[in-house]
Each structure stands twice: as C-alpha cells, then as structure tokens.
Amino acid sequence: MARKYFGTDGVRGKVGEYPITPDFVMKLGWAAGKVLSKKGTRKVLIGKDTRISGYMLESALEAGLSAAGLKAILMGPMPTPAVAYLTRTFRAEAGIVISASHNPYYDNGIKFFSADGTKLPDEVEMAIEAELDHELKCVESAELGKALRIDDAAGRYIEFCKSTFPSNLSLEGLKMVVDCGHGATYHIAPSVFRELGAEVIAIGCSPDGLNINDGVGSTAPEALAAKVLECKADLGVAFDGDGDRLVMVDNTGYIIDGDEILYIIARDALRNGRLKGGVVGTLMANMGLELALQTLGIPFARAKVGDRYVLEMMNEKGWRIGGENSGHIICLDQTTTGDGIVAALQVLTAICTAEMPLAKLRSGMNKFPQVLVNVRFAEGRDPLAADAVQQEVAKVEQELAGRGRVLLRKSGTEPLIRVMVEGEHEQQVRDMAQRIAQQVESAF
C-alpha cells in the first residue's frame, strides 16, 4: 500500500503547509497514540531541534497524545539519537522527534522511534496512517494523558556519549573545533568533548530559532574548515540540525565525509579485533570506500539510500558498522541509530589508539570524483521513465567502461531527482552528470 504521509524519514514539509500544520500534527499525535496505546506502556517522549516552529508542533503533538490517553514527556531541544537512547532508558512506548534534520528553519518534520530505539516498523507507520483517516475522538476526561517536562535529559545523554569512549583513554592535549550548526547538539556536544579532556572551540552554538543549518554545521563544512585553520586546531567536527550526521575536518582543512569516517572506524575495529562481519554503505557510497575496504579484506554491501535501509541490511547480515556518505554513521555496538557525537568519539578512539593524526588515518582511502546534480520536478511526474533519460544513462555507462557508476533516484524527502555520476576523472564525470540532468529536465 502506498504511503500518504510518511516518507523515508517520517513526515516532513514546509511549516504552515499541509501536512506540517498544527491541526494535522495534533491529529498525527492522536493517531499515533491510538496505535501505540494498544502496545502497552502509555507514555511517549518528545524531543525537538531548535527551529522556532518546534514550540508550536510540540504543543500540537502533546494535545493529540493526551486526547488518545497517553502521557507526553517533553525533553526540549534534544538530538535525534538522544531521543532514541532515552526512549529505551525511560522504557517509553515510543519517542517522537520534531525536526527536519539538515533542512532550513522553515521546514520541519515528525519522526518516530519504537520502544527499542529504532525507527518504527513499516506496519506501525501504516497503522498510524490508517487511523488518520478516522475522526479524532477524545478519550473520557478521566483517561486524558498528562504532560511533564524533564530537566536532566541532556545530562543523561552526555554521560551516555562519554561511556562510548574507552575509559583508559583521554582527549587531553587535543585541540578541536565543534560546530553544532545552531542545532540540537549545541548544549551537549561541546560538553562531551570537554569533559573527556579536549580543548574545545565551539561554533554554531547560538540558536535563535531561525539560524539552524545556516552557513554552519555538517551541510556547510567550509565554516568548520576555516575555523580549524584559523585556530590551528588538530581537527574539527560538525553536526547537522538534529545531531544524527557527522562531518569532520583534519588539521589541513580537508573535509572528511561519511564514507571516509566509515573507513576509519572499520579499519580501527579490524586492527583491534572488534570488527564483526563487514560494512554497510549505500548506493551513493564512493567506489573508493569499497576498494579501500576490499584491500583490507573487509566485506562491503550497499543498501538503498536512507539510514533505515542501512540499519535493516546491518541487522539482516549481523554487521555492526554502517552509514551514508552524508554522515549518518551507525555503530550498533554503541547505539541503535545514527549518532553524530558517538561516531565522532569512535574516530577519536582510533586517533588515540593508533597514535596517528586524522589526516594520516584517512589516507588509506582514495575517493573517486563523484558529482551529484539535483533536478527539481513536479509531483506526479516520473522523468526517470523517459526513453531519452535511459538512453543517456546507457551512453554514459558505456563511456565509463566499468570504472565508474551512474545512479538516478528520487529523493525521499523533497521533489528532487538526484543524478550521481562517479568515475576516475572529475571533469569527465561533471560533464556526464550535466548531460543526464539536462535530459531529466527535458523529460518534463
């Protein structure tokens, strides 16, 4: 059955436009409450990032859950992985995150975690969608859910993050820049690294409701690179608005993406005898990652794009390390979902145990030039089915002669066609990507 509301990462859109409106979000809270109340514990955690619309949507969700008879535990600004972790430790029936991740402030979204801290199964999302088609009916007054705020959520999560860094190691003597993108990690990430001994220069830690992901954070790592060079820091880390993505910068200002982070973590796990199986990447993962892991004898598999699909494949194979080149890194030995802070701590562990700078650790992987072009399209159209597009793709693949890849896919969160071409020569793949993008544009 086709989904009406849930995309690859929950419900998302522009604030004030359906479905990100107060009335719909209240009904979504009610529908989720109706489904979840059948499963046991009648309490749900709610966290949010720093968007100004989070206040409005939090109140709407709270009202909907209360109408269904569930208790809402409000945590305020909290990274997505923190909600996943705290949902488990509070033994709640579910966790809800109000965030649009790396998108601008005027977007927002709602995503859910199940009691075990993983994304909701498809069948539960479909059950919530089915309830949304029914009229909202409030439970009896005596059965209404209450709401309460907890003040120590950030402290609990800080201690959890620190626990994923070996107790016999220290970040003493390390100078690092931490860019929180004016997002949900602003009051957490700097404390984690400072308390482990690092000298921290914090940027992107002054959210005003409108500046999330604006020229800072993992989607704009140039700001981090500039600060690392300016301060002569050893490295830098940048998170997105909800803290589930990580991008790093070494002391030369080189920007290290999710594929290179996966390589560093996997190589360290292999070296220390902790690697279980292989590594799961996505269809967008750089060929350089696959070849570098192959050289180390580490198996590599590609899942569909989206951290939920990476996690599904990791569980199917019993592997513990996976992620996306965008910086979603999942370390199942430590947590249940993508966690930017925890992933950064795994890289810092590798730096400490190998006694090598970040620049040296990443040098074992040589990335292929990869060009991504986004083409906006009208909803309801399918330009990927056009003969001209398919012919151009076939032509490009023939020219690459097995030393590169072409990938076209629809975004799961925006009306975009993503055209990716990868090969050995940057100008060649840039030209190829533009040729295909032009055919996609012409198709509608």
From Swiss-Prot:
Coiled coil: none
SUPFAM superfamilies hit by this protein: Phosphoglucomutase, C-terminal domain (SSF55957), Phosphoglucomutase, first 3 domains (SSF53738)
Organism, scientific name: Aeromonas hydrophila subsp. hydrophila (strain ATCC 7966 / DSM 30187 / BCRC 13018 / CCUG 14551 / JCM 1027 / KCTC 2358 / NCIMB 9240 / NCTC 8049)
HAMAP family on file: GlmM_B (MF_01554_B)
Lineage of producing organism: Bacteria, Pseudomonadati, Pseudomonadota, Gammaproteobacteria, Aeromonadales
PTM summary: Activated by phosphorylation.
InterPro entries, sorted: A-D-PHexomutase_a/b/a-I, A-D-PHexomutase_a/b/a-I/II/III, A-D-PHexomutase_a/b/a-II, A-D-PHexomutase_a/b/a-III, A-D-PHexomutase_C, A-D-PHexomutase_C_sf, A-D-PHexomutase_CS, Alpha-D-phosphohexomutase_SF
GO CC term, one of those recorded: cytosol
Residues engaged in binding Mg(2+): 101, 240, 242, 244
EC number: 5.4.2.10
Family affiliation: Belongs to the phosphohexose mutase family.
Keywords: Isomerase, Magnesium, Metal-binding, Phosphoprotein
Modification sites for Phosphoserine: 101
A Gene Ontology BP annotation from the UniProt entry: UDP-N-acetylglucosamine biosynthetic process
Gene Ontology MF annotations: magnesium ion binding; phosphoglucosamine mutase activity; phosphomannomutase activity
Active site positions: 101
Protein name: Phosphoglucosamine mutase
CDD domains, per database record: GlmM
